[in-house]
C-alpha cells in the first residue's frame, strides 16, 4: 500500500509527464506476463532511449494527474486495469505502431488499446489502428523531399537536354561548313 506522500509524488510526476507528452495511450494489460511487458518496454527503450515509457499506474492517481494536466474526457480510458504509454521525446506515431504490433503479435484483443491523446487530440480505441498505419515523421520527411526534388530533377533533365541539342546543332553546323 502506498503512503499518501508516495501517491502525491506519483500524481505530481505523472502530471508533469502528461503536460510534456505528445502521446498518452491507455491500455488494458491483463493477459500479459511480466516477460511480455518487459519485452514491450525494451522495444520502447530501444527505439526511444527513455523518451517513451509503458507504466502501470492506479486509475485514481491517473485521474488526478490528467485533471491537473488539463485533460478532459479521459474517464472512458480509466476503467479496469490500466497502463499508460507516454512519449515525451520522439515520434509518437512510432510508439503507437510498436504497441499495436506488440498486441497483434501476442494475439491480444486490440480493443484493450483503449485510446488516449495524441498531440492534445483525443482518439478512441478504433482510431489506434489508423494511427498505427500512419507513416512516421522520417517517412513523411522522405516523401516531402522526394516531392520537392522531383520537379527540380525534371527541370535539370530538360535544361541538360536543351544544352545537348544545342551542342548537336552546333556540331552539325560546324560539319556542314567544313564540307
From Swiss-Prot:
The lineage of its organism: Bacteria, Thermotogati, Thermotogota, Thermotogae, Thermotogales. It comes from Thermotoga neapolitana (strain ATCC 49049 / DSM 4359 / NBRC 107923 / NS-E). Belongs to the universal ribosomal protein uL10 family. Keywords: Ribonucleoprotein, Ribosomal protein, RNA-binding, rRNA-binding. Part of the ribosomal stalk of the 50S ribosomal subunit. The N-terminus interacts with L11 and the large rRNA to form the base of the stalk. The C-terminus forms an elongated spine to which L12 dimers bind in a sequential fashion forming a multimeric L10(L12)X complex. One of its GO terms (cellular component) is large ribosomal subunit. GO terms for biological process: translation. PROSITE patterns: RIBOSOMAL_L10. It holds the Pfam family Ribosomal_L10. GO terms for molecular function: large ribosomal subunit rRNA binding; structural constituent of ribosome. This is Large ribosomal subunit protein uL10. The keyword RNA-binding applies. Forms part of the ribosomal stalk, playing a central role in the interaction of the ribosome with GTP-bound translation factors. The keyword rRNA-binding applies. Signal peptide: none annotated. InterPro entries: Ribosomal_uL10 (IPR001790), Ribosomal_uL10-like_sf (IPR043141), Ribosomal_uL10_bac (IPR022973), Ribosomal_uL10_bac_type (IPR047865), Ribosomal_uL10_CS_bac (IPR002363).
